[in-house]
């Protein structure tokens, strides 16, 4: 069923033009045409326009056009080629994925009849406005002898009829129930008429034609914006599922392209016709800006190597506050750094050594910088890690409110005893497409429950603040042992497409939103990667004109959903949840980050994340928009509540006079605000220094950070421990019990220190120290954690690496244990890199 719909969408693709052997009127030959011809691939050739094709007048010519269109549309599957998999695979996968999640998404939408009727009315009025506007445009052009307006109205009407015929046929063929029918599952072949949406198809076909006829930014924004709003209203009104609207929107847009490309008279004006393939893929062989590329894992040796080069002044466009980076972006930075090192007569030997290893690792991507066919697949790593913990660690049950023994480890489970992970990672690219997967087996032993005093303290700092005075006390966590964990986990996995340096990915993805090494306040790898849809400007851009002073800029946005939240509070229903069972309706989380470099030595970034919707509050477009744009507050769980917002600001500055020796950086964070600049009394801070080399010891670097979530004065109505907590989402800023931000926690002060000696860019020995003090104003009697340890990593062959670490920890939380506790954590990891240093793929 999905495949057949994708073939219908192929009506707007190149198979039709290939069948005709022509480039549509108004088109210009693209570089991709020349490149394809040079490679021997069959492609369209230009011919002069047939004036008969421009007979755009009411009458038999319209009927003939529509018949030709329908013939081309329904015969297009026979002309599909292997190369069309570049767009069929992601579009088909996206549609199939949306169909699989349609029911869950629809369940999040408001069931209020008044709200649904409002959206239905909006979509009906909207489609009537499109139809009326199209007719009015034709009549106005006819009576004023404005041939351009007359053509625009006529072609828009033709496209609407074409797309309507296609979707009506598909409705009959698929018979899908609407969201309000039957058991609300949206079953196919059940006599319904939900798939696809005729409203969305007609709106997008008209918008597509009008946006080509009048290609200015404002007309396109109005046309496409109105079409998108109509489609969204059909979903919000529970008339269609999201996949219905997605497929019909694609059909409508492509049909509008096809009508315009065939019958537009270029002498009347309008925009240049460009096939959707050229619009999306630009050219072939592909240019780097259109090459799909996997992100480099956050625990890779590549980031410390590039950061050392940046601190030495050779990577001016590396954005440390927004990671991970794609492999292609790393290759671009390495290429630029190589040029700078070559041009610098005083470049240190350290820089050359780092570049040699990076050049070897990124040899395929460096070749692709000149353009190429990046059809490539790689088994990235196969690895196994054993971690032994003697003594009681701070682990599950204690991480959020007390602290944790192992930090920034993607939320992997651990307990006293022997812990094991074994897994592998790999990726594949083909043109603009990319897929990545990192799969692990994880094992952690069982553990006893925390004592009653600790469980009571957890109840007091998490749940009690939202219980009204005089109401029954909320439950404390049960005295239940923590079960052992033996599981397979897709730790990190996503699929995506890249266009013009914009990467669109969906799946579980790591994030690191700050320059610090201890873990950014806003988004770190302390919790497992969150399943999300992400839009990321993977390479920086520069604004035009006077705005160029902002320097290179990167932008990122995501929408995801959390797991493992147990409690939620509402001003309407009160506190609901359970300590033993996660909520069935987990909250959503969105966020954006923008970073800029006004100078090569100064980087700054701003970001916001918001938890919203979830149990008792349906996910709607209004709620989604409110989470992004609202700056006010409302009672928890009500229509006026924009969600649980957090804002961050970070910077990195290479200090004058000693730029190649000293870098200062900071990371400020605030809770329940959009920026720490609005109220520094509510802000927490990480401040750090980094020295990429020590005088007389060039292979040694040093880093120190101080951090706190314990501001000097906490003003009412904010209680102690309000960081990472919210009076609606009382399970906090967590995913499955792990803090998404910094390990410093809800109210604490701490420090982190590292000294690393680099034998080579990949072989090192490190000493580290970490200390945390939890305020007694937040946790009864407070608490402390002190870690000291060391680690080493070495590549014993070109494809095999070993790493190990030892950490001695003391912690003192009287509510957990009346005496100070100690534990020792030792870890050993073996990693096989099958493709390390090998070349892959083809380049031009």
Language-model segments: residues:
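N-terminal periplasmic/intermembrane-space "pro-region" immediately following the signal or transit peptide
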Residues: 17-57, 61, 275-417, 423-431, ...
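Transmembrane beta-strands of outer-membrane beta-barrel pores
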Residues: 99-103, 113, 232, 430-432, ...
